[in-house]
Amino acid sequence: MATRFTINQQRAVEETGHNILVAASAGSGKTTVLIERLIQKILSGISVENFLIVTFTNAAAKEMRERLEIAIEKRLRDANDGMKRFLQEQLLLLPAANISTIDAYALRLIENYYHVIGLDPQFRLLSDTAERDMMRQDVLDTVFEAFYDETHPQHENFIALVNNFGNPNQDDALRQAVLKLSDFAEARPDGQQWLKELDKNDLATANGLTQSQTYRLTILPMMIARLEQLLEIAQATQTNLSGVPELKKTQQAFDEIIAYLVNVQQALVDDDWDTLRGKLSQLPKVSLETKRSKGIKDEPELLALLAQATTVKNNILGAKSDLKNVIDTFFKFDQNDWQYVEKQATELVNTLVTLTQACQSAFTTAKRDAQLVDFPDLGALALEILNDDMTRKTVSGQFQEILVDEYQDINQLQETLLTKVSNGHNMYMVGDVKQSIYGFRQAEPTLFARKYRQFALPDNPDSRIELADNFRSQNNVTRVTNLIFTQLMDEKLGDIAYTGEAKLVPKANYPTDVTPVFNMTIIKQPNVTTSEDEDESQEFEKRQAQYAQLANQILSLRDTTIFDRKAEPAGMRPVQYGDIAILTRSKTGYIDLVATLRQAGIPTQVDSVGNYFQTMEVYLMLDVLRVIDNPHQDIPLAAILRSPMFGYSENDLAAVRLADKKHDYWSALTVFAQADQRSQTVIDLIKKWHQLAIQNDLVALIWAIFDDTSWLDYVAGMPGGAQRQANLHALYDYARTYQENTHAGLFRFIRYIEQLQENDGQLGEAPQEANEQAVRIMTIHASKGLEFPIVFLPEFDKSFNTQDLSGKMLIQKNAGIGLEYLQPEALVAMPTLKKLTVQQALKRQSWSEEMRLLYVALTRAEQQIYVVGTVKLDENEENQRLIALWQRAKETSGQFLAEDLRLSAKSYFDWLLISLARTKNDDLESWLGDGHLPHVLGPETTLDSQISVRFINESDVVIPEPQGNETKEITRASTYQAEDFARAKAILDYQYPFQQATRTAAYQSVSEMKRLFEDPDRANLKTLNVLENGQLQPANELVSDKLVLPTFMTDGSQKPSSAAVGTATHLMLQLLDFKQIQTHQSLTALRDDLVTQGRLTAPVAALIDIDQILNFLQTPFAQRLCLHADSLRREATFAMIMPANQIYEHVHDQASVLVHGIIDGYFIDKKTKSITLFDYKTDFVRHGRVEEDISKMMVRYRGQLTLYKQALMQEFPDYTFYEPQLIILNVGRVIPITTK
């Protein structure tokens, strides 16, 4: 059935001839529209070679390519002959099409045009982050050492900079500042120019601080906005007080407050810094009536009015008020003092820029000397290539259209690069600025926002197309999202006004009887005065309570139903664990979360529970490597001895220590080994491994450790053994990749691993197969682009991360750089005025991104959202803070809540509260409100959503027990009865009903069972038959008359068997890289490598028919394998249980038989949820009887492929299976087999 597009979707598919920005909100069918646009252009005769399609992750690029392939194949079925040939050609061109990340495209440009910029074509991409970081650290060491030299011209300035950030013995903070500054510059097309202009601080040079651009553009707008909000609240309070004679004193107080605010407001514009500072400091000292004042104490309405006025007064003039905080920070010093500090800081910035440029230059030189190019180089070098006019015209002429997916995540350098590739009117940009959540990667959402405004102007030739219809979420999810963001997100905070066309429009088709669910659970934590250690314990208990609440809610959902809109036909069904996702801001606490859910019997799937390097099996291997590198390290040596690898007890370790108390532990072990053979064996092993390390063969070293200690086998027997083995194999792979790229030794590898740990690289445990019936746990970042029927959002009360707002140096793309200045004589550190302004800009930027993360989290849900947070309702300070937020939000007029109110939020929970303050929520109003009716919401906000709020005590939350595990009390009879003896006799006389099955193997391989489906070797092997007396012959299924002669009894002249050649051919096909174009030369090289590695013997290798393999690779099926190379699985082992009577014709028992085997290969198409398996055959086919022999092979192997298919169907029950393909290499044919 053809997709029915909306008017705007159709515009997005068809419109052309100019630049187009498609603003595609969550769930609007963006990818479907993009693919349809591409397929329509292809059908019009434009080749895929003429598109440049870029996105921001390899996974997204892969998905785009796969979807386009499916779309072309779909059109191919109904195409006429001419179009069919063209579409088939497009399928062949698709693997090489320009569908990639921007970095990958830049790399392709460099590989093709390296000569334009004089780059050595033999360069290698430095893709390993840890390796790059190590190289940068080495360069920093060299450059810093040069600057520390007293003869260096910048030495004195450098020392002043070092002392400002720390001291010569502790310059880590300065090193990090240099790297951070360099990273910022590398993400800009004008990076070097930007660096040079950083020391232009107009606060230091302006004729008066209030005349500086920084004041006019940053400090003044901030102060004006805050004063306007305070003035509005004060005036509203004064209005409420008018006509109330009992509160005359309070009225007079607010007259003074308003006069003060108006006076300061004017002074901000008119006065110089010192005059303004003086006026700000003259806070009015006012007093109000008290609760016991005459005529008030017995009047509830007057008491409520007085309480409101008191709160407002404290919010304006109180010691902890926002205004008082601004005065104490920004206006701490007079103009002379501030400008002195700014001038000193400017000199430090100048030195910092010089140092950074020196490090950048040295790093570039080091990379070129080593023939390396890193990821930041890619964009810069590609841009340098495109600065050549002739090259730019050549490149630009290749593309009819440039399509940019996820355009909101682009940075300035990437934008400049793509603009140069375009012809000025063929850019097609798709994205949603509301989902720009990659600021830490230098993403620049303002680029999208700028075009969003400009492309909507009537005189602009380019166009903006809005896709606001949401086809994902049930109406209540969409309406709650709109309720929240029409009050929170505007151009100042969020980079787009969430109004009009930017709002979501509910368009998903759900039955009217689907219950709308937006559940907000607030866990009340008792307020207990605690020490710092107890605070940590209380924080842990808070998380545990939330996780337990999640478990309870998830278990309660098992008895409910959801609407499955993707089923055929769509309809209601019970909730499954796979319908549920838990989204978090970070991975902190994942170990506890998973443990809690598993304790409740809830299966989970999580990308990464913890740091890979902290797993026991890997950590121990790293200690072994440290000891091999340097055995005189007591802690690693003691650790490996005490570990299961060597099994020393505490007493053993003590005995070793007593053997030599004066020297290190290795010396003691050496002495102890003279009388202890086990210790001598350990020493011999370490020395053996050390010799391997000297040879710089990391791969052989790690495998030798595995082999000599059986460590791989040991961990397999531990809980989670498969995962532990996967982790160790991953370590082996890290070592192999590192060795291939660097050829460095063990010491550098250990340092490389430590660099990964220091950088908190968050290497997750080695991935296992996905469990589709498990609760998914992931970060909000990882959930982007996904959708789930039910979404849980725990820890909504968790404070925003403010780490980027602190530190000795702050950088913001527009505000520049701000330092903390250390006064050298007094050794007093203070933030400069510039740093304070940068901090404000950074906070606005950070809070904007947090707001967009909240939007992404809410819009992942299809039907139900559960929010969980914890508050200390009994803690007066926190309670008063939340009440103040609620009251201010209630009193806000207009569409959006006040900017400073939104900025004062500390968590998502705060934002959720203030967005509900003007709605009629009795539960929250009874907690935070004062009984006054809420103000009317803005015209863009509607009250058509349903939100349920409930409070529970932390002490009432318990982790549920898994169902079915109840402990039953067992009682024992005190005397034997007659029936006990009858039962005993029945047991003794018991006849096993599956006696026949005991004479068949309960563990069968498919190769042993092939005979049952016409085995090809049946003429050479005896088969198991039922004897004439009906008894089964107790033997293996297939037995040979003769045993193969061992090698030492042969003269070596025996010709390799056809089976050996077939096995060798299978090995080559197993290792073949389907992502690369294969030639006779490359296949021969692969065969020869296998001989060199000892995996094939030369006589066998000589008989492998390379031409047969090449002929197969030319088949259409082989091309499909190339297109699905990423999802290709080869040599896949399986095991399954089958009833014996389904396997053996003469056995009638239903006893279970374990069948195991190895499937040559299969590939998965995740888009269509389909699987195609295949099997290689090297059987001889007679030239004159090809069809006859193929027919026999189809019959012969049908049973075998049936078993393979059944095994995969058990593993992938929800997937469609196409006919298995029998690949007959002898004639280069691929035959589909109809299975039973």
From Swiss-Prot:
GO cellular component: cytosol; DNA helicase complex
Pfam families: PDDEXK_1 (PF12705), UvrD-helicase (PF00580), UvrD_C (PF13361)
PROSITE patterns in the cross-refs: UVRD_HELICASE_ATP_BIND (PS51198), UVRD_HELICASE_CTER (PS51217)
Residues involved in ATP binding: 24-31
Cofactor: Mg(2+)
Gene Ontology process terms (BP): double-strand break repair via homologous recombination
InterPro entries: AddA, DNA_helicase_UvrD-like_C, DNA_helicase_UvrD/REP, P-loop_NTPase, PDDEXK-like_dom_sf, PDDEXK_AddAB-type, Restrct_endonuc-II-like, UvrD-like_ATP-bd
GO molecular function per UniProt: 3'-5' DNA helicase activity; 3'-5' exonuclease activity; ATP binding; ATP hydrolysis activity; double-stranded DNA binding
E.C. no: 3.1.-.-, 5.6.2.4
Gene3D superfamilies, per the entry: 3.90.320.10, P-loop containing nucleotide triphosphate hydrolases
Keywords recorded for this protein, A-Z: ATP-binding, DNA damage, DNA repair, DNA-binding, Exonuclease, Helicase, Hydrolase, Isomerase, Nuclease, Nucleotide-binding
Stretches assigned to the UvrD-like helicase C-terminal domain: 463-785
UniProt domain UvrD-like helicase ATP-binding: residue ranges: 3-474
Catalytic activity: Couples ATP hydrolysis with the unwinding of duplex DNA by translocating in the 3'-5' direction; ATP + H2O = ADP + phosphate + H(+)
Keyword Hydrolase appears in the UniProt entry: yes
Summary of the function given for this chain in its UniProt record: The heterodimer acts as both an ATP-dependent DNA helicase and an ATP-dependent, dual-direction single-stranded exonuclease. Recognizes the chi site generating a DNA molecule suitable for the initiation of homologous recombination. The AddA nuclease domain is required for chi fragment generation; this subunit has the helicase and 3' -> 5' nuclease activities.
Entry-linked HAMAP family: AddA
Family: Belongs to the helicase family. AddA subfamily.
Subunit structure: Heterodimer of AddA and AddB/RexB.
NCBIfam families reported for this sequence: addA_Gpos (TIGR02785)
Protein name in the entry: ATP-dependent helicase/nuclease subunit A
Species, as recorded: Leuconostoc citreum (strain KM20)
